């Protein structure tokens, strides 16, 4: 189960009800759902994890993506990356997490398996959802001499 896997990545868990089931705090749960939405290319799951003022900043896009335009962006992203040979399998590493003043901030290095596509991402989540993501791209070819 993905949530079980995510707990090993530093997702905060707290004891819930008397049965001892573990539940995540709201912003951690919404962040986990957001990740699932991307892994599964599930627009409904993705939208349900974002706040009303959500902004996604991808330098490959002419303007920032908002909550309303996120499903169309996800389709463009999938088409773009499949042209590069991707199958939507992600490798995330060098993850750093900070939970401060009600905002969960995640930084991570991302790589899209089967491609040279990689970069950094910062994602910010409140208890009403993911409200900001910015990605950058790293190009090994242009940095080699």
What is each of the regions a protein language model found here?
Residues 40-57:
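Short, well-ordered alpha-helical segments enriched in acidic and aromatic residues
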Residues 25-28:
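Amphipathic alpha-helical repeat elements characteristic of tetratricopeptide repeat
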Residues 2, 6, 11-13, 20, ...:
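A beta-strand edge to alpha-helix "cap/lid" segment located at domain peripheries
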């Amino acid at each position: 189960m993905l949530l079980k896997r995510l707990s090993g990545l530093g997702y905060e868990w707290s004891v819930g009800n008397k049965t001892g089931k573990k539940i995540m705090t709201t912003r951690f749960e919404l962040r986990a759902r957001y990740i699932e939405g991307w892994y599964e290319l599930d627009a409904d799951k993705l939208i349900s994890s974002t706040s009303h003022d959500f902004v996604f900043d991808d330098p490959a896009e002419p303007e920032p993506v908002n909550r309303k335009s996120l499903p169309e962006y996800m389709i463009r992203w999938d088409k773009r990356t499949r042209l590069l040979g991707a199958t939507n399998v992600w490798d995330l590493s060098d993850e750093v997490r900070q939970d401060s003043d009600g905002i969960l901030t995640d930084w991570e290095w991302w790589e899209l398996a089967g491609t040279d596509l990689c970069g950094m991402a910062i994602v910010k989540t409140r208890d009403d959802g993911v409200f900001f993501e910015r990605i950058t791209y790293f190009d090994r070819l242009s940095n080699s001499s």
